[in-house]
């Protein structure tokens, strides 16, 4: 733990669980809202829980929809900000599987693996305004066959949006809080209009907050959601939704352990002290203990010898503090859907979608000089550092559909998914002036002076599934099915070291890689022993597609390295087995489950350079397997008409089964028998909630056990306990009827702790790997909400 000097206001975001209920039958994807949180998924042949969108309203204003899933067993979600919406430092782990090994959808539309520099989707925080989430469904382990994902090795999260209301209405919410946080949310529902019963909704959200570490960084988000529903008779309807997002975020700075101790818990970027950033870059370029005329830090020649070679205290390297970094994202995603019944025995669903994204990751880098840095007469583009923007854009479109046959005891479902994705990625460098910062990290930059390794990608995804849900008698449900998928990705280098290249040119590379398996089976059952007890079990297999992005398998280094990787590696694969018990009493619900997972063909990259900043080409290899064993238990108690309690406990033992070896047999990483990095073994969640219709509130406790950010487990991160609080009041009479005031406080006890990581590393015996984010301090927010 760390000692910090700030004392903030007191009040936090937590999930109020009043009104929690448990499903009596398999949860169906209806459009009707629910005011309950479904924990146990009664009747399902696998672990499935559904959380209502109302739960998000008790979280901090604008919190990520994933925040409402934190209380579920096996879920480890953490980040550097109190909202969980800052993507670079938000971390989701489910039963030992990382976020990029899970699947995510919104109204069935794929969101990709939700990685930060996403190549095939976007984060749910940008895909929809959090207040517009109707519900979120979590399927652990074998996941769902119908999930439109090719990364769901460890489970899937399906989000569903609120439909427009049948009557006219409006919602307005205003929020304010620590770090100058302010947020507006507004939504208008037209109600049914016209002779066809059309209904629509329009929503807008505008958020601003300062970065809590130094209050100089700024984070803004603007989102627009439009949805239209058109009934077609009594048993069919069409829907159209379009969601736009503009996000401008200054970064939180990751640190090493020794940097946190030396620089302090609140250490961050240098902005607005640009001259200090220039000085640190000059000094870094002057350090030359090797005596070869080039910097030991940057590899550059000296840019200002008069600056000397001694860093001013407390700084000891150019990596201790950069001037600024940011993430810029513009997204537009939309879908047209048609669902309904063709007859009493035949249901169908069809969806067409598209998504465009433009992104840039600005960073004031001291490792590259501006083009005129060595010209003493220059007054522009003459700084000893440069503005680097990792830039990318993509356009993807696709369609998915399913058809359900009700054949009495058998429910047959057949579905498919197709997607085409065209993208472009590259590192682009822009000049900076020595006298002042002439570029804004929160604005897209154009006309670079240098472009390094720009790639064009083309990816095609095809997937289908078929399943039979058989109920031979009322107490027994059996599920049989399988899915098949093929993902083919081409990557062609367009620019090599600032030179446009084409086939036949030196430096040009091309790689096509496929992941394909047309039989990935899944089995499951649920058996109701009596009115109170039920057992369930499942087994399933999943395959992950290769990520198609810069530095990936087919877009990395030389043609020889790409050809070697394509010929050598296999896609990652998981096999999950699960057995559980559900119990339902008068005022109690309970769940116990055990699972076992075989995760094979784990993929890793070896780098010839040890520099975390300037990376040479990678060598990709499958490096062995992971075996996971775990148990989960959940208890819900309805203590009175107004008071409820929830406790969940998870134990997950995920271990590497092999050491990582290089091609010549030498040891690279000693991982055999080590715990999987980034996954705590113990998780404990507890919540107590009160709601009498007017006064409401909740106190939430979470314990995350020790975890590792190194593969060799040589530097553990301490366990942490956190408390969150929410309290509010609904007005039900007079002019204030329909109004609500609430207060949220995150990290109530103001704990200092390491929360997340930007990357996992081989080992860190000296604590100098700069990959850790500290957690946000106590933060308080007040929200006024009015419904009309």
List each model region and its residues:
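Membrane-embedded beta-barrel scaffold of Gram-negative outer-membrane proteins
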Residues: 186, 337, 341, 345-353, ...
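Acidic/polar loop-and-plug regions of large Gram-negative outer-membrane beta-barrel proteins
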Residues: 229, 237-333, 362-388, 437-449
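Face-selective signature of the C-terminal outer-membrane beta-barrel domain
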Residues: 311, 315-318, 328-362, 379-496, ...
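Gram-negative outer-membrane beta-barrel transporters
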Residues: 473-475, 589, 593-603, 616-711, ...
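C-terminal beta-signal and adjacent terminal beta-strands/loops
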Residues: 543, 600, 645, 702-709, ...
């Amino acid at each position: 733990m760390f000692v910090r000097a700030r004392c903030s206001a007191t009040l936090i975001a937590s999930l109020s669980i009043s009104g929690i209920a448990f499903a009596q039958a398999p949860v169906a994807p209806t459009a009707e809202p629910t005011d309950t949180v479904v924990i146990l998924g009664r009747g399902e042949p696998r672990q499935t829980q559904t959380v209502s969108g109302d739960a998000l309203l008790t979280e901090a204003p604008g919190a990520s929809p994933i925040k409402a899933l934190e209380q579920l067993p096996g879920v480890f979600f953490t980040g550097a900000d109190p909202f969980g919406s800052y993507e670079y430092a938000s971390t989701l782990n489910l039963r030992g599987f990382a976020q990029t090994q899970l699947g995510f959808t919104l109204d069935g539309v794929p969101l990709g693996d939700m990685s930060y520099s996403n190549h095939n989707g976007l984060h749910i925080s940008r895909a929809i305004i959090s207040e517009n989430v109707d519900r979120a469904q979590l399927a652990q382990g074998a996941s769902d066959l119908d999930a439109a994902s090719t990364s769901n090795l460890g489970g899937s999260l399906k989000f569903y949006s609120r439909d427009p209301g049948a009557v006219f209405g409006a919602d307005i919410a205003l929020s304010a809080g620590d770090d100058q946080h302010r947020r507006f949310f507004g939504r208008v529902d037209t109600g049914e209009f016209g002779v066809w019963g059309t209904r629509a909704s329009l929503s807008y959200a505008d958020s601003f907050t300062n970065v809590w570490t130094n209050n100089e960084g700024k984070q803004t988000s603007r989102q627009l959601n439009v949805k239209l529903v058109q009934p077609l008779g009594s048993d069919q309807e069409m829907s159209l939704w379009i969601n736009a997002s503009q996000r401008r975020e200054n970064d939180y700075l990751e640190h090493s352990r020794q940097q946190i101790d030396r620089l302090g818990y609140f250490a961050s970027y240098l902005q607005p002290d640009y001259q200090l950033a220039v000085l640190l870059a000059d000094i870094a370029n002057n350090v030359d203990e090797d005596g070869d005329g080039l910097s030991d830090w940057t590899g550059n020649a000296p840019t200002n010898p008069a600056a000397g070679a001694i860093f001013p205290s407390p700084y000891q390297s150019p990596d201790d503090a950069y001037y600024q970094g940011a993430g810029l994202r513009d997204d537009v995603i939309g879908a047209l859907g048609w669902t309904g019944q063709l007859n009493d025995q035949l249901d169908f669903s069809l969806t067409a979608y598209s998504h465009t994204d433009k992104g840039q990751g600005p960073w004031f880098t001291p490792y590259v000089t501006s083009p005129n840095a060595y010209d003493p007469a220059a007054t522009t583009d003459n700084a000893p550092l440069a503005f680097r923007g990792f830039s990318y854009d993509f356009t993807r479109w696709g369609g998915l559909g399913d058809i359900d046959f009700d054949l009495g005891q058998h429910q047959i479902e057949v579905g498919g998914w197709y997607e085409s994705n065209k993208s472009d990625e590259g590192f682009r460098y822009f000049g900076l002036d020595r006298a002042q910062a002439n570029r804004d990290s929160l604005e897209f930059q154009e006309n670079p002076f240098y472009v390094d390794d720009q790639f064009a990608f083309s990816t095609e995804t095809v997937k289908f599934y078929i399943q039979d849900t058989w109920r031979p008698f009322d107490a027994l449900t059996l599920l049989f099915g399988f899915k098949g998928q093929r993902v083919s990705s081409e990557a062609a280098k367009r620019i090599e070291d600032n030179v446009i290249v084409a086939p036949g040119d030196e430096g040009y590379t091309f790689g096509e890689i496929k992941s394909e398996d047309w039989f990935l089976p899944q089995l499951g059952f649920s058996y109701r022993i009596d009115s109170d007890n039920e057992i369930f079990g499942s087994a399933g297999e999943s395959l992950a597609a290769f990520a198609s992005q810069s530095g990936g398998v087919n877009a990395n280094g030389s043609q020889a390295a790409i050809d070697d990787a394509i010929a050598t590696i296999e896609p990652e694969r998981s096999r999950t087995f699960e057995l559980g018990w559900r119990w339902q009493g008068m005022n109690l619900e309970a769940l116990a489950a055990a699972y076992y997972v075989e995760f094979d063909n784990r993929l890793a990259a070896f780098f010839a350079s040890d520099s975390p900043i300037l990376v040479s080409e990678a060598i990709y290899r499958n490096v062995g397997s992971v075996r996971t064993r775990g148990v989960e238990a959940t208890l819900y108690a309805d203590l009175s008409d107004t008071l409820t309690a929830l406790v969940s406990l998870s134990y997950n033992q995920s271990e590497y089964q092999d050491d990582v070896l290089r091609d010549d047999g030498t040891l690279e990483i000693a991982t055999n028998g080590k715990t999987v990095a980034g996954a705590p073994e113990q998780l404990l969640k507890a919540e107590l909630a009160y709601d009498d219709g007017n006064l409401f509130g909740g106190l939430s406790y979470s314990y995350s056990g020790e975890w590792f950010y190194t593969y060799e487990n040589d530097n553990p991160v301490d366990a942490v306990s956190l408390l969150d609080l929410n309290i509010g009041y609904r007005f039900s009479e007079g002019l204030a009827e329909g109004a609500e005031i609430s207060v949220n406080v995150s990290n109530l006890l103001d704990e200092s702790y390491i929360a997340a990581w930007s990357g996992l590393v081989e080992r860190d015996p000296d604590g100098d790997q700069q990959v850790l984010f500290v957690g946000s301090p106590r933060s308080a927010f007040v929200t006024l909400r009015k419904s009309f």
